[in-house]
Amino acid sequence: MLLRDILFVLITTVAVYASIYAPQPILPLLAGEFGLTTSGGALLMTAVLLPLSFAPLFYGLLLESQPAKRMLLVTIAALALLQAAFGAAESYGLLITARLFQGACVPAILAAITSYLAYTVDREHIQRAMTYYVAANILGGFVGRVLSGWVATNAGWRYTFYLIALALAGCFVAVTRMKADSRLSLSSVRLSAVMPILRNGDIARLYAVAFTIFFAFMALLTFLPFRLKEIDPSYTAFVISMMYSGFLMGIVMSVGATRIIGLCGGERRAMTIGLVLFGISMLLINVPSGAGIFAIMFVMCGGMFFVHAVAMGTMNKLATENRAVANGLYISIYYTGAALGSWLPGLIYQSAGWAAFTLTLTAAIAGAVVITRGLRFSG
């Protein structure tokens, strides 16, 4: 695989994840402008995550019979137009509609990217390739949030989405220059391809861990802006967006995941350590201080994204056949967790408060630790 093509794939990943998470730090602002409740504002995240929860499996299956590059070109173009539509929307209904259609495009792009990597990178290097992919999606989430907060504070929130649309247009041009993924199998699409993957107990457990960590993490990220407004109503969108700076630690941990796995003595132990850090930071996030939350987010993001990088890389090593399907299923499962987490725990937050909310999420993370200890491969 050409280094240039890897760079194009990673830049596209950054732009796509920026498009997903850009609204998150400005949810209180959007809720105020459109007269929404906390849960109504959170639905702007659920709307894009819900299609992500079931569409990736279909796209993963389709990629066993279609070139990933072709799907990338079609869906990147559509996503760019939908970002511009979100920026121009004048009603809550149009915002939700644009987000739903964005959610239909994003999983196609992500499944195409992971499949492109899986089929064009040598098996010996797939773990490292996937950790760089995870690092790119973390960077994209961070860039999208900070860009959104800064632009909303200084120029108006709509310009964020016009800028993202332009970035995606640039990605479209870059993808046209990528080498075709000729090694993809042109087999027929069969849903039965899913069952052999799920029969692998270790892969099934990795899927369960992915569901749980994204459920807890997305819940925290979605409702954190509202919590910060409770702590200090004077916080601007940019100040709130900077609370996501901990994502930078997630990049470091993901890129270094392969080396850290060796230091920990294997994937299972490494994932357990990451989950424990994630759980402890979820308890500490109760501190009623913006500065404290800022610091804790570095630990939380480092632990969570390390677990994600290890789980995804390990799953690709264990999936000896139909990797596009395995990746599509992984994306589907963890975004199912994210979609549920972006709304359901908010009911606890609204009715019982922040402490009950974070305790519930900590209990979910503890469940992921139990699942991880049941993994049968070495380490």
PLM segments and residue spans:
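Helix-breaking motifs and short loop linkers at transmembrane-helix boundaries and internal kinks
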Residues: 35, 67, 88-94, 105, ...
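Helix-loop-helix hairpin linking two adjacent transmembrane segments in secondary transporters
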Residues: 123-177
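Cytoplasmic helix-loop-helix junction between adjacent transmembrane helices
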Residues: 98-137
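Helix-to-loop junctions at the C-terminal end of transmembrane segments
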Residues: 55-67, 253-266, 349
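C-terminal transmembrane helical hairpin of 12-TM major facilitator-type secondary transporters
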Residues: 267-311
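Juxtamembrane intracellular "pre-TM" segments in multi-pass secondary transporters
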Residues: 178-207
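Paired small-residue
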Residues: 78, 82, 93-102, 291-299
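Conserved MFS/SLC helix-loop-helix module at the cytosolic interface between two early adjacent transmembrane helices
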Residues: 54-91
